Amino acid sequence: MTQKTFVSGDVLTASDVNTYLSHEGGAWTSWSPTWTNLSVGNGTVSALYYRAGRLIVWKLKLTFGSTTSVSGAIRFSLPVAASTGIEFDNTFGTFVDATGSRHFSIAQSISTTVLQANMVNSVGGYVVQVVTSSTEPFTWTTSDQIFYSGAYESLA
């Protein structure tokens, strides 16, 4: 969706309203996240977002293939840079093991363009974030999945 700046004297049309004020915000756009400590290999990624003004709504799904691998804390890039000072600790996801077990996850903001996928665990009666690795929250293998979705204010 192309951004439009309205100036004095412009006429707001039905098309403008549908494009800029609707919760639909236009068509979903795909993006290719940049991964850190994760090699997609022959896995499949579906990463989509839409923009409504400065609001970015996004969703991400990664299904592991036989050559997908994890070597440390999983990080991925956002589709559009976030406004400075925004924390993403309210972005939730799920890690799904090929056996069917599901693990709740929270994405931690590393920068305005990168999130880190952390698992959630209970330690001493408290819920804490735990960094992912090749064996956390489980040993990653073919058909495992990572799901995330979120919304945030873009930088521009």
Predicted regions and their residues:
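Surface-exposed molecular-recognition determinants
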Residues: Q3-K4, S8-A14, N18-A156
